[in-house]
Amino acid sequence: DALSDSPQREDIPYRRKQDDRDFLVKQRLTFNNGVLSLPLGLLQGQNMGVVLESLLVHTNEIDNFDRLPIPFRAVATDIATGEAVVFDHGHLPLAIRASLALPGFFAPVEVDGRLLVDGVLSKNVPIDVARAMGVDRVIVVDIGTPLKSASELTSVLDIMDQTTTLLTRTNTEKQLATLTDRDLLLQPALGNMGFSSFADAQQAIDAGARSLAEANGVLAFVAPDGADSGGNLASSRPQRQAIIHAIEVDNSGKVADEVVLGMIRQPIGEPLNLARLQTDMGTIYGTDYFSRVTYEIVHDQGRNTLLVHTAGRRTGTDYLRLGLNLVDDFEGDSQYNVGASFRVNGLNPLGAEWLTRLQVGSEQELYTEFYQPLDYGSRYFVAPFIDAEARNIDVIDDDDPIVGYRQKRYGAGLNLGRQIANSGEVRFGLSRYRGNSRVRIGDPDLPSIDFNEAFYSLEIDRDTLDDVNFPHSGEEARLSWRQSEPDLGADARYQQIELRVNKAFGFGPNSLQLGGFIGRTDSDVDVAQSSFSLGGPGWFSGFRQDGLAGQNYQLGRLVYYRRLAPSYFNTLSLPFYLGASLEYGRVYNRDDAGFDTGYFGAGSLLMGMDTLVGPLFFGLGVNEEGHEALYMKLGQTF
């Protein structure tokens, strides 16, 4: 997790979790004042910073690195001047974080107004820094990798690795030339291992151990029995965390300090709760306002202040995401959608945002919403919206459309709500739509339908899944209720309620999802635009996508999948899954008459891959109604 910027999904704010619910890819383009802005590194180093802060929290009282149990120096490089920067004092986690910010891989770290990167560019083997500390002998471990041949340069990481090696060879050789017979040089045989060889960590450790065992003169560096070797950081850790007397924020982001403080749950007057603080750091970073969120404990006159640093994003906080989803049954029936969303963050100190979505294809949509928190804790909010959409609604007989309509609707609404921690949300809304349905398939003399809709609505949501595509733990639930009300302008009065519950379980590489889904229209009114669309993989498999539509439905579902070793099946090392689903349920229009499938079973065999553009599934679906279908689907399925 240290080599990732993403917090645990369960730690991020609920609103940001919902960004996963569409088919847009996670990678995004960033804009600053309307201009495309590229990142300063592949990673911001957020999780790396939190790990260092947590491991070294007990050193916060030490400002002079000579006072550490083992005197220490960190070396970084000023990326603006190329000068070496030697840290002999300051905040230890920040110094270490700057000293390992490999250019291109990690974004530079700002310290005292200077942008710093890994010291590899200026002093890769800082022997002179060690001698300046007054040591008698130095032990040098040279892990410089040999240059790769052209045939071995097969990825962007290989190119970055080779570039770093070329840039550092000169300063490394200059430093190694100062070694004397009293010093010890270890050069482990690392072969082709480089900075990106994370999977080879154990082999690198073993190579270092062999290098030490084979070295001459090691005994000269062994302290005599009873000698003080200087101690170590682990033995200096306190038995309990410091009591926190105050919490302060050093904030350079777009939102008010109170917004950040509202996400920190550390009680005043109690010991530092490190696990909870790490979760809070993930929540703050997950708002997307900051490039780095760190903390330190400031000790002054017997008082301990938790100081949280939040650095605003230098590259901007407005994001564009693109995406594609498609379904194909290999029988000539396919659906596709291409979409984009643009989110403008931090419109005011409370953290307002403006979200716009555009989608073209089988289902078209233009949606824009202004989301305004009403308090610094970001609990209550108001969200007016404008919506225009178009979709196909088919009348199905034996899995074939006999009449197809193209439905278009446009309208606006207002939602009032409350977020429930990071796991859920409650929304109450009013909305008003106008629309029409035109014949797309079938008798062209069939009449078109114009309609008016107006709703009161209530939604209660919960989402604690660890992954939205292939979850291994957590649950999701949604209760939706809406009342079509003629007093607001609707053509008919009816109530509709839908409950969706899905629970994920994990055991080793295996995952199991247990789900129950119910939709009910509490009226005999036949309103086509209010029907539930079902059919397709996981939603009554064997039927084509959206091949079932009804005013009511019940569905129980069990999904199993197993994650397999990626290298067995693809060269991109993408997560690969094999699994199956079992489904049982019913779709109908009325209890006493009209369309009714009766209760029937369905199931599917599937294989899936978590690709860079979303989950990709191939499968075979069958059901007791006598239908079967092959399918390929790019986009969320279960």
Task: Identify the residue ranges that each predicted region occupies.
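Patatin-like phospholipase
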Residues: 1-282, 286-293, 298, 313-314
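Flexible glycine-/small-residue-rich
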Residues: 76-78, 88, 188, 249-253, ...
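A generic beta-sheet turn/junction motif
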Residues: 80, 253, 299-301, 505-509, ...
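Acidic/histidine-enriched alpha-helical segments
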Residues: 148-150, 219-237, 430-433, 474-477, ...
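Gram-negative/organellar outer-membrane beta-barrel architecture
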Residues: 275-280, 292-467, 532-538, 547-550, ...
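C-terminal outer-membrane beta-barrel translocator/porin domains of Gram-negative envelope proteins
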Residues: 286, 292, 305-307, 319-329, ...
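ATP phosphate-binding glycine-rich loop and adjacent ATP-lid/helix-beta elements
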Residues: 604-606
